């Protein structure tokens, strides 16, 4: 039996602490060190019983971990991951993979040249609900996918914005939240060829959006829409519908994604599938509905188990750097479309 993987944690903010929570339950890996320059980081490391380093580069040199989780601020993701690769350390890199495509391309090139794996933390792909939904879609249960409706509608309280950077450009719901939904839409429905978008900050007046409407044209011919707002009293979002994170009260009967094709339709996260009976079709005929079964499991924990296998070179990353870069390219196309009022195509990502 393999000994537990020695995993270092770079960044002990909210996501870093969530990773530690799940790492404690993992027999395949254990926390070996913490790196974070914040004043409270040393105390957190002491509570966790591991050494603390203000500088992650010194930690990599002295501790020589088997793998590292990078969960520091977004603008440091690429530089920190590059330092890990230079030290020969596999990385679980929190989303977003980076802030700008140019730096992410640099990271993708470093992964290719070094052969050191990087798993990007779009953890919802690991959720059994999404695994089953993708199986149904790719297995032809919906026929030819035709339309996709995605909703992200909830209310962030005023206290959320007491942290100043959350009111600044680039820190709005597109990069912070909707990037998850865009990644799942790519994962479930395929690549997006073109987008149109409108964003608004009319509710709060901050320097970032509180409402967005996006039209998506998929490469397979399907058309989709994503409507989002973090300033509304509504139950339609992955956070509220899926029950994935217990800090949010679950609205289990409400969907956040509605996918329809020539042979059926699917609501997510309920996994409720609609179709006509054999030999009947058309709007005068009743639709049959069945809820697909799916074993519940914690996506972040499943992601960590997958990361251990990635670090040991047993499997390829479910979400590699180039894959995550395509989600970032889609997000950048949406921003450009909203700014210019024109349809925009996501940048091409090699690999």
Regions found by a protein language model. Name each.
Residues 33, 67, 147:
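Short, Asp-centered acidic motifs that coordinate Mg2+ and/or phosphate
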Residues 54, 93, 118-120, 149, ...:
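Hydrophobic residues in well-ordered beta-strands that form the structural core
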């Amino acid at each position: 039996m393999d000994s537990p993987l020695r995993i270092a944690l770079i960044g002990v903010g909210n996501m870093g602490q969530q990773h530690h929570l799940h790492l404690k339950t993992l027999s395949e890996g254990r926390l070996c060190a913490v790196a974070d320059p914040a004043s409270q980081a040393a105390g957190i490391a002491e509570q966790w019983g591991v050494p603390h380093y203000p500088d992650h580069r010194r930690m990599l040199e002295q501790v020589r971990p088997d793998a590292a989780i990078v969960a520091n601020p977004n603008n440091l993701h690429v530089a920190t991951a590059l330092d890990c690769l230079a030290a020969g350390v596999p990385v679980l890199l929190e989303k977003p993979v980076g802030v700008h495509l140019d730096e992410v391309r640099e990271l993708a090139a470093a992964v290719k040249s070094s052969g050191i794996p990087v798993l990007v933390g779009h953890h919802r792909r690991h959720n059994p609900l999404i695994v089953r939904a993708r199986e149904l879609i790719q297995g032809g249960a919906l026929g030819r996918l035709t339309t996709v409706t995605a909703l992200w509608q909830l209310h962030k309280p005023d206290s959320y914005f007491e942290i100043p950077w959350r009111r600044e450009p680039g820190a709005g719901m597109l990069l912070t939240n909707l990037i998850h939904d865009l990644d799942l839409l790519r994962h479930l429905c395929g690549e997006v060829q073109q987008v149109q978008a409108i964003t608004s900050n009319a509710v709060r007046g901050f320097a970032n959006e509180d409402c967005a409407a996006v039209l998506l044209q998929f490469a397979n011919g399907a058309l989709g829409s994503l409507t989002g707002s973090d300033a509304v009293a509504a139950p339609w979002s992955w956070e509220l519908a899926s029950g994935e994170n217990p800090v949010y009260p679950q609205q289990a009967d409400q969907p956040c994604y509605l996918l329809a094709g020539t042979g059926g339709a699917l609501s997510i996260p309920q996994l409720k599938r609609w179709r006509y009976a054999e030999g009947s079709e058309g709007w005068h005929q009743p639709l049959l509905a069945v809820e697909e079964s799916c074993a519940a499991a914690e996506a972040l924990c499943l992601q960590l188990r997958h990361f251990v296998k990635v670090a040991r070179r047993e499997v390829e990353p479910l979400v590699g750097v180039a894959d995550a870069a395509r989600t970032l390219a889609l997000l950048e196309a949406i921003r450009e479309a909203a700014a210019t009022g024109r349809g925009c195509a996501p940048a091409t990502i090699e690999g």
